[in-house]
Amino acid sequence: MRLTALTVSGFKNLKDVSLHPDTHYNVIVGENAQGKTNLLEAIWILSGCRSFRGTRERDYLCFADSGPMQIQAAFDDGRRVQTITCTMQPSAGKEKRFLLNGIPVTSTGSLFDLFHCVAFTPEDLALINEGPEVRRNFVDLCYSQLTPRAVGAVRRYQMILQQRNAVLKQALPAAAAQAYLDVWDRQLAKTGAYLTVQRSRYLQQLAAVCTELYGAISAQQEAVTLRYQANVFGRDPDFSDCTEEQLAAQYYEKLVRAREEDRALGFTTCGVHRDEMQILINGVSAREFGSQGQKKSLALTLRLAHAQIYARKWKQTPLILLDDVMGELD
């Protein structure tokens, strides 16, 4: 994946930027608060994803200008050059609109499938320091770039989970509650089993590549280990002898057994939304015992490992965006 041209206007503090990047490596230098990270963020937004900085969309518009925002990039995926445009009008509800080769895009999922980026920022320390949800989201985003249908499965799971939790919060008669829950449990089990398999397969690949990359970074002095703690199926589950139908049946049975507790608590206590990816250095928790430099090296390793896995899968390297990559590395 090569970025061949980029124009940005009216995005945060970037009033009028036009670039024709080198096809291999580009280094952006400048004083603090000049817009270096904003430039990377603008490129990332064209993938159809939310800002990697958590920026609210209404804050995309230029600080010192009341005009519209436009981000446009031409990219070469090895087959042809295409153009993605993102616009936002101050007077149109501050909603993003995308064009692909001049044609309106109705689903940002199509951009996610076309324009692949891997971004590393200092905020990626959250992959190590924060709770399990951050790591689950990271893994889901990564395998979704390898298996496009998984994007819909992740969204579907969240929708079904919300519906199940809504039933759990209602003061329904026992028979009615069981009937409603059975409908949602069967759907949740099917989708949850699929996502568990996707996470397991991806994490096996990620663990192998991370071991290699982190070994090189640490001059073979430290070893990194990734463990998948699947809430329904246990640590590092082996699904080689199971079909998804069999896994869905096991998942469903666990949901059924948890119904009474879930009704008492008002939420779903088991499922892939409670999975964890544990990261260890030399056998101990990186989150609890790692230095700041080790944690940043690990976060960078996770991002670069995914880029390598992506390249193997699709026979092309994604666009890699690195922000302040050298600070605080051991």
State each model region's role:
Residues T108, E328-D330:
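Conserved ATPase-coupling elements of RecA-like P-loop NTPase cores
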Residues M1-E31, L172-L321, G327-E328:
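Conserved NTPase motor "head" modules and their coupling/switch loops across ABC/AAA+ ATPases, GTPases
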Residues G48-V134, D140-A150, V209-E212, L247, ...:
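Nucleotide-state sensing region of NTPase/ATPase domains
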Residues I45-R56, A305-W314:
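Post-Walker A helix-loop "phosphate-sensing" segment adjacent to the P-loop in P-loop NTPases
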Residues S110-C117, T121-K190, K315:
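A conserved P-loop NTPase coupling/switch region
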Residues Y25, I43, P122-D124, G283:
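ABC ATPase nucleotide-binding domain signature
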Residues K36:
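Conserved lysine of the Walker
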